[in-house]
Amino acid sequence: MSSYGGGYQRESRGDSYRSRGGHDGGYQNGNGYSGGGGYGGGYGNGYGRGGGAAGGDRMSNLGAGLKKQDWDLDTLPKFEKSFYKEHPDVAARSEREVEEFRKKHEMTVQGRNVPRPVENFDEAGFPQYVLSEVKAQGFERPTAIQSQGWPMALSGRDVVGIAETGSGKTLTYCLPAIVHINAQPLLAPGDGPIVLILAPTRELAVQIQTEISKFGKSSRIRNTCVYGGVPKGPQIRDLSRGVEVCIATPGRLIDMLEAGRTNLRRVTYLVLDEADRMLDMGFEPQIRKIISQIRPDRQTCMWSATWPKEVRQLATDFLNDYIQVNIGSMDLSANHRITQIVEVVSDFEKRDKMIKHLEKIMENRGNKCLIFTGTKRIADEITRFLRQDGWPALSIHGDKQQQERDWVLNEFKTGKSPIMVATDVASRGIDVRDITHVLNYDYPNNSEDYIHRIGRTGRAGAKGTAITFFTTENSKQARDLVTILTEAKQQIDPRLAEMVRYSGGGGGHGGYGRWGGRGGRGGGRGRGGSYTASNAAPLGNARRW
C-alpha cells in the first residue's frame, strides 16, 4: 500500500476493484467491483499487428490491422459515470432566472433533461481537491461553456459542446475527466487508459496535457501524449507503465494499437476535441476505427467550434441521447471582440502591405502577431524575408521537427520572437493567450478556417485585430466572408462587396507574385540548435524591432 497526497490511501488490488476516490463523499464509488472477467488478459488478441500500408495510401490503410470488437455489455465490468448532484442554490433558481442567465451568456441548449447551468465554481460540486486547484489558478468564475458544460459532463450523459476557440472548453471536459477517473478501479498491469482525448494536432494535444497535468496532480493521475513527428520510445514506455489519461492524435494512436502497445478496453470517458478540425484534416476514417475499439456504453464528449453536417453525422453515429450546448450563434460567426480588417489586394502587393502593418503593430513592444500562409513553402519564404529585413519572425508548420516547433512556440509565447508565421495545420494547436494581431497573408480554403484563424486573437475576454489580404483568386469565398463581417458589424471594403455581386469565377492565375521562387534548403543554425533554413536566417542589420 502506498500513500498518495490528498487524504486517501491507494490500495493494492486483490480480488476486488477499489475506488480511487474517497476525497469527498459525493463522488466515491463504494460499490466494489468483482474481479471475475475483469479487463485484464483478453485484450491482447483484440489488436492485430496489421501489416502496415506497403504500396498503398498509408492514411487510408491506417487501422486496417485492428480487429473488430464484439462487446457483450452483460459480461463487461460495470463502471460509474454519473456524479452530478445539483447544488441547492442552483435548484432554488426559477426557470425564468435560468433562461435569463442562458440568454445573457448566449447559451442555447438542446436535448432531454439538460441540467441547469452553474454560476460559480462552488455550485459545480467538484471535490475539494479539484476546487482548490481551480481557485489557485486565479480563475474568478466559470466561462459560459463551463457554466453549462460541467453539469452536463458530470451527469454522465453524452455531450456536444459548440463554442469559439479560447472559450475555456479544455477545462470543461478535463475536470469531469479527473472526477471520472477517481471513481474507477485502479489500473492493473496491461490495462489501457480510462480517459481518451483525441485532438487534431500535436500542439493542441500538448496544450491539453499541460491543463490536465495541473489539475490531476493531487490525485496522482498519470497521462501521456501520443502524437507523430517524435520518436515512439518514450510514448511506448508511458503506455506500458500505465496511464489513466491518453491524449492522442488519431494516426499515432492507431500505430500504437496496431502494434499492441496499448488497448482501449478500459476507456469509459472519450473526448473528441475540435471535432470539426479533425474531420477537415481527413481523420474521420481513423476516428471511426478508434471508436470501434471502445466499449459502447462509454461516456462521449464532443467539442467543436462549428457544427457542420459532417460533425452532426459523427455525433449521431457515436453519441447516445446526447445533450448539447451552443455558445453564441448557431451560424458561422466570428468573435465580436475581434476587429476584422479585410483588404482587397493583388498578390504582388502583399509583401509591402504586410511590412506597413507590422511597422504599426510593432510600435507596441508588447504586441504579438501571428501570420497565416496557405503553404509551408510560403511560410518559410516570408519568414526568411522578414528576418533578412530585421524582423524577429519564426515559422511553424507540419514539416518541421517537433523540437523545432516547440522552440518556436516558446520563443513566440515569451515574446522573444513576437512574429510567428504558421500554416493552418499548426494553427489549431497554438494556445497563446496574448496574441494581439492575426494577419492572413493568404486567405484560407474555407470560412471555417477563417473563423479559426482569427480566433487565435481576442481570447479570454481580450480584444484583438485580424487583418486579411483578399485577392481575386479568393472571389468565390467573398459572399461567405461578407456574411461573417456583416454579422460582426465590421466595415466592408467596397471592392469586396463588388466581388460578391460579380463572383462566380476565380481571378487570374494567382501565382505567388514576388514569392514565386523556391526556397533554399540550407541548414544553418538558429539560437535553439540546428533548425530549418527560414528560422535560421540571420536577422538583417536594420533591426526593425
From Swiss-Prot:
Motif, Q motif: chain positions: 119-147
Chain ranges for the short sequence motif DEAD box as given in the UniProt record: 273-276
Catalytic reactions of this protein: ATP + H2O = ADP + phosphate + H(+)
GO biological processes: nuclear-transcribed mRNA catabolic process, nonsense-mediated decay; rRNA processing
Domain (Helicase ATP-binding) ranges: 150-325
Main location class: cytoplasm
Localization terms from the record: Cytoplasm; Nucleus
Transferase is among the record's keywords: no
Domain Helicase C-terminal per the UniProt entry, residue ranges: 353-500
Family annotation (CDD domains): SF2_C_DEAD
Entries under SMART domains matching the protein: DEXDc (SM00487), HELICc (SM00490)
Pfam family, one: Helicase_C
Biased composition (Gly residues): 24-39, 513-529
Record-level Gene Ontology MF annotations: ATP binding; ATP hydrolysis activity; RNA binding; RNA helicase activity
Keywords: ATP-binding, Cytoplasm, Helicase, Hydrolase, Nonsense-mediated mRNA decay, Nucleotide-binding, Nucleus, Ribosome biogenesis, RNA-binding, rRNA processing
InterPro entries: DEAD/DEAH_box_helicase_dom, Helicase_ATP-bd, Helicase_C-like, P-loop_NTPase, RNA-helicase_DEAD-box_CS, RNA_helicase_DEAD_Q_motif
Composition-biased stretches (Basic and acidic residues): 10-23
E.C. designation(s): 3.6.4.13
GO (cellular component) term, any one: cytoplasm
Known partners and oligomeric status: Associates with polysomes.
PANTHER family: ATP-DEPENDENT RNA HELICASE DBP3
Similarity comment: family membership: Belongs to the DEAD box helicase family. DDX5/DBP2 subfamily.
Name the record gives this protein: ATP-dependent RNA helicase dbp2
Biological source species: Neosartorya fischeri (strain ATCC 1020 / DSM 3700 / CBS 544.65 / FGSC A1164 / JCM 1740 / NRRL 181 / WB 181)
Gene (UniProt): dbp2
